[in-house]
Amino acid sequence: METLTFEFPAGAPARGRALAGCVGSGDLEVLLEPAAGGALSIQVVTSVNGSGPRWQQLFARVFAASTAPAASIRIHDFGATPGVVRLRLEQALEEAGHD
C-alpha cells in the first residue's frame, strides 16, 4: 500500500460532496468534499506501489483542460486502470457541481 498526495490550483469551492465508485468491487472510489483556499488537494491510497508518476500524469491531464473546483479528494484504489480513474474522477466532479 502506498499513500500519495497531490495539489493543484483551483477556482471556486465545489458546491457539494460526492462519492463515485466502490473500492470493494476491485475498482476504486473517489470521495470529494468542498474546500476553501483556491487549492485542490488529492490523497491517493493505492495497492500499487511506485505508481506516483502515473497518477501525477493523469491528474495533470485532467486538470489541464479546465479549472478544478477547490476541494479535498480522497481516492482509494485497488489497481484501477487510468481510464477508470478518470471516469470516476469526472463522475465525482460532475456530482459535486450540482445543487
From Swiss-Prot:
Principal place where this protein is found?
Answer: cytoplasm
Sites where O-(phosphoribosyl dephospho-coenzyme A)serine occurs are at S25
The record's account of how the chain is modified after translation: Covalently binds the prosthetic group of malonate decarboxylase.
**What is the annotated localization of this protein?**
Cytoplasm
Q: Which UniProt keywords apply?
A: Cytoplasm, Phosphoprotein
Single GO MF annotation: acyl carrier activity
Among InterPro entries, the record links this protein to: Mal_deCO2ase/Cit_lyase_ACP, Malonate_deCO2ase_dsu
Q: Name one GO cellular component term.
A: cytoplasm
**Per its UniProt record, what Pfam families does this chain match?**
ACP
UniProt record similarity statement: Belongs to the MdcC family.
Job of this protein: Subunit of malonate decarboxylase, it is an acyl carrier protein to which acetyl and malonyl thioester residues are bound via a 2'-(5''-phosphoribosyl)-3'-dephospho-CoA prosthetic group and turn over during the catalytic mechanism.
Q: This protein is called what?
A: Malonate decarboxylase acyl carrier protein
Q: Which organism is it from?
A: Pseudomonas aeruginosa (strain ATCC 15692 / DSM 22644 / CIP 104116 / JCM 14847 / LMG 12228 / 1C / PRS 101 / PAO1)
